[in-house]
C-alpha cells in the first residue's frame, strides 16, 4: 500500500496522530477513511456515572464530618484525588489505542468548548462524566441536542451554580432567590 499526502493529512490532522499503518489505510480513500472514523466512542464500562458519583460525594462528605468529630487523622481526599487521576489516565489510554481517533478528536474539541473547572472535590469527580454522558453520546447529533444535554448535566449545573437556581414563581423565587444567569451568559 502506498501513502498519499491526503492520507497523511486525514490521519494526522483529523485524528490524534497517525499510528503505524494508519496513513497507508487512509491513503486508499481519505474521505471514506474519515467517515469510518465517525463511530461511537466506547468508554470503560467500569467508570462511575454522575449519579453514582453524586451519591459517593454525599457519603464522602458525611464520613468526613464524622472523622472530624472523632479527630480521625485519615485524609480521604487523597484517595478521592487518586481515583480521579486513574480515571483520566484510563480515558487517555483508550483514546490513544482507539481506531476511531477522529471521534476522540471531536470529543476533545467539544469537551474544551464546554469546559468546566475541576476545582474542588465535587467537580474533580463530576467533570469527566460530562464528557461521557453529555458530549460523547451526542457527537453524531445536531449541536442543539448536544447543547441541551450539556446544560442539563449535573457537572455543568454545579459549575455554573445553577443547582441553586430557582424559578421566579417557586417558593424560593418568591423569597428573592431567583434565576441564576451564569448559564445564559455562557451560552
List each language-model region with its residue ranges.
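A contiguous strand-loop segment
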Residues: 1-187
Amino acid at each position: 500500500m502506498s501513502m498519499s499526502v491526503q492520507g497523511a493529512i486525514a490521519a494526522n490532522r483529523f485524528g490524534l496522530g497517525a499510528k503505524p499503518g494508519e496513513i497507508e489505510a487512509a491513503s486508499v480513500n481519505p474521505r471514506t477513511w474519515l467517515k469510518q472514523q465517525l463511530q461511537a466512542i466506547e468508554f470503560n464500562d467500569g467508570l462511575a456515572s454522575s449519579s453514582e458519583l453524586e451519591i459517593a460525594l454525599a457519603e464522602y462528605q458525611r464520613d468526613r464530618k464524622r472523622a472530624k468529630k472523632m479527630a480521625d487523622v485519615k485524609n480521604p481526599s487523597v484517595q478521592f484525588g487518586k481515583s480521579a487521576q486513574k480515571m483520566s489516565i484510563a480515558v487517555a489510554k483508550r483514546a490513544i489505542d482507539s481506531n476511531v481517533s477522529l471521534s476522540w478528536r471531536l470529543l476533545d474539541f467539544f469537551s474544551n468548548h464546554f469546559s468546566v473547572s475541576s476545582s474542588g472535590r465535587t467537580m474533580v469527580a463530576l467533570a469527566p462524566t460530562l464528557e461521557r454522558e453529555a458530549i460523547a453520546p451526542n457527537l453524531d447529533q445536531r449541536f442543539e441536542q448536544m447543547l441541551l444535554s450539556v446544560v442539563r448535566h449535573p457537572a455543568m449545573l454545579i459549575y455554573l451554580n445553577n443547582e441553586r437556581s430557582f424559578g421566579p414563581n417557586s417558593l424560593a423565587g418568591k423569597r428573592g432567590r431567583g434565576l441564576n444567569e451564569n448559564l445564559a451568559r455562557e451560552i
